[in-house]
Amino acid sequence: MSNKKNDRRTQILQALAQMLESSPGARITTAALAKQVGVSEAALYRHFPSKAKMFEGLIEFIEESLFTRINRIVQEESNVIARIEMIVTLVLGFAEQNPGMCRLLTADALAGETERLRVRITQVFDRIETQLKQVIREADLKQGLRPAMGVAPCANFLIAIIEGKIRHYVRSEFKVKPMEIWPEQWTVLAQNLMLNR
């Protein structure tokens, strides 16, 4: 019984993510979601007490997907510049592979929803920025490199790039992919991001 319930929850979340992708700018209603899943609205509410909880389920998926991999990068990669590249590339790649989630990451799909959801999205980016700050600080300790503009401004600059590329992806209705010209951009950025002591 529990597996069937989890399968239905997963099916609901996948349908919600697909609707976010296929209907840029549109508000998702529980009636439309129920129709997409092929169940009644009451059936949706048996699995999630509110639409906000459905969005939270997607945000939890984003957090788990990103932070599990970010932690692995930090543990396994010793080169700081490579770590930074891998973290930024991970987030951009995740965004490109999950266009519907980008509407959550930009809070585009959260207009009119509870403030708690926007706070959760802000926290996702804050956590990524904190992780980048930690990696940048380690550059000095482990490799004798210092950021060209200070730790906090450097991490903030990287987050601005991530958010800007995701927002551009949403604004283009998923035509301009975040990874499309990222390798060339990273080459220029990496040359100017850190300085030798």
From Swiss-Prot:
Gene3D superfamilies from the UniProt entry: Tetracycline Repressor, domain 2
Family that this chain belongs to: Belongs to the nucleoid occlusion factor SlmA family.
Listed SUPFAM superfamilies: Homeodomain-like, Tetracyclin repressor-like, C-terminal domain
Keyword Transit peptide: no
Superkingdom of origin organism: Bacteria
Gene Ontology BP terms: cell division; negative regulation of division septum assembly
GO MF annotation list: sequence-specific DNA binding
NCBIfam families from the UniProt entry: PRK09480.1
Limits of the HTH tetR-type domain: 6-66
A single Gene Ontology CC term: bacterial nucleoid
Natural source organism: Marinomonas sp. (strain MWYL1)
Location of the protein in the cell: Cytoplasm, Nucleoid
Function recorded in the entry: Required for nucleoid occlusion (NO) phenomenon, which prevents Z-ring formation and cell division over the nucleoid. Acts as a DNA-associated cell division inhibitor that binds simultaneously chromosomal DNA and FtsZ, and disrupts the assembly of FtsZ polymers. SlmA-DNA-binding sequences (SBS) are dispersed on non-Ter regions of the chromosome, preventing FtsZ polymerization at these regions.
Keywords carried by this UniProt record: Cell cycle, Cell division, Cytoplasm, DNA-binding
Major place of residence: cytoplasm
Annotated DNA-binding residue span(s): 29-48
Quaternary organization: Homodimer. Interacts with FtsZ.
Protein name: Nucleoid occlusion factor SlmA
PANTHER family to which the protein is assigned, alphabetical: ACREF/ENVCD OPERON REPRESSOR-RELATED, ACREF_ENVCD OPERON REPRESSOR-RELATED
